[in-house]
Amino acid sequence: TSSVTTTGTTIFVSTPDETELASAKFQQEIREHIVKALRKEAKSYLPRRLKYLAEKYDFSYSSTKLTHASSRWGSCSSTGTISMNISLMKLPFELIDYVLIHELSHTKFMNHSDYFSQLVKTYEPNYIKYRRELKNHSPNV
């Protein structure tokens, strides 16, 4: 039988030679372990990084939430809750920071107006480049 174990952020897969790697069941099992590893890393890193950036740039938010949405990297509610996709952990650190600054900026402007864009640019001058780069990645696992 196959076995999949997670140690920290390393996923070990052991399968007999005859295992059908393309089977839906096997793929789902692997996906579940990847999500578990991403969630563990995200829980450790993302709230601390968000807090650091908020303090550095004088933003405030009410709470944080980790998600695993399929189409969004993050969001900010009208009550100031910032949701962060665990798949952010698949990205380079500069793109993670861009997404977090983007969401923090929504605590001041709940839209994508010119004022919002200017605020993001103030704290991340490369935001256009990073926004473009982000399109090459997917929050899906």
What are the functions of these language-model segments?
Residues 1-97, 107-141:
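Active-site-proximal or metal-binding-adjacent scaffold patches in catalytic folds
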Residues 100:
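Walker B beta-strand of ABC/ABC-like P-loop ATPase nucleotide-binding domains
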Residues 103:
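Walker B catalytic acidic pair
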